[in-house]
Amino acid sequence: DNVDTYITFHGVESAMALWVNGTFVGYSEDTFTPSSFNITDLIVNGENKIAVNVYRFSSGSWLEDQDFWRFSGIFRDVELQMVPHIHLKDIKILTHLNENYDHATVEVTPMIEKKEAKFKAVYTLKYKDEVIGQKESKDCCSPINFELDDPHLWSAEKPNLYQLYVEIMDENGLVECSQHNVGVREFKLIDGIMCINGKRIVFHGVNRHEFSAKTGRTVSYEDTKKDILNMKANNINALRTCHYPNQTFVYDLCDEYGLYVIDEVNLETHGTWSELFDKAHILPDDKPEWLDIILDRANSMYERDKNHPSIIIWSLGNESYGGKNLYEMSKFMKQKDTSRLIHYEGLSHDRRYNETSDIESQMYTFAVEGTSR
């Protein structure tokens, strides 16, 4: 009676509808971010029937025209989660450094969901096995700060990680415990140069699709770890998740081993703006009916990935031309997060909203101006 049951689909291409014991639960699009459904009131003791209808094509397909192999189906994990009556629904972790980088504040903002119950939350920050600090709170949403002298900073060269433990207790004892990695770092532009902890970053990066020659879109943790270690062995220090959010453990590995990440929204509308079509067909462009859809995709990526120190840049997508909707997405992300930069390469095709991107880049830079070479 004191738990809720959720089912989470971490990757379904391109859309899905869910039934539990014959009752329709919901519908979801966005191939590359999780979809969760509360099924507490629909399950029974004993055997239950979960039915999923996967749609190869949907309205979301217009936004998923990436250059890759075409598949459909459930290709990432499916989880059943039993959530206690008091639990940590969300957590946001920010780190702030002084100008000398010898003092840091770790700011923890929880969102504890409770059902008319008294509780206490204990926040413990450790570095390796050493307890750095511990705080208690009976408030569900107020920030908790830890002050660190001479902090162990995170960078690709030295990916130091602290561990934050959150224990939630009621009058009967421990209800829930979770662990979160914390990378203390500051990423910002200094005189137009991208810097980590005050030092210039020289990027040696790659684009990486999440794909296996043997298992297609389903890529194991072990194979992913090999990829990350091969990158490190070859002096690669950055990757772009082209062209969609990857599995969560990709970012965990980048946090652990030290890679800078450009995390990219699942958005590419390549086929709508080629030379074969006029501008009336371009998506999402300025069309108001597409704005909420792309903002939802950006928000899903942000909320899932916001606490990873390895992510230093948010990418709004790939090869989706330009326009007001992408500009609105950029503003949305900047309101959510001021600790990272925003990138969108497609501005080189449409200069109406140059403020969309903090960074200027070109996908295919021509060596000779005015030619295809």
Question: Which functions belong to the PLM regions below?
Answer:
Residues 84-115:
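Surface beta-strand/loop "capping" patches
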Residues 33-37, 140-146:
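Short strand-edge motifs at loop-to-beta-strand transitions and within beta-strands
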Residues 3-4, 43-47, 147-161:
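Short glycine/proline/serine/threonine-rich loop/turn segments at secondary-structure transition edges
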Residues 91-92, 165-232, 252:
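N-terminal carbohydrate-binding accessory modules
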Residues 20, 103-137, 144:
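Beta-strand-rich binding/interaction modules
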Residues 228-231, 238-373:
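Substrate-binding/catalytic cleft of secreted carbohydrate-active enzymes
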Residues 1-89, 115, 245-247, 260, ...:
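Accessory beta-strand-rich segments of carbohydrate-active enzymes
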Residues 25-26, 132, 201:
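Short hydrophobic beta-strand segments in globular cytosolic domains
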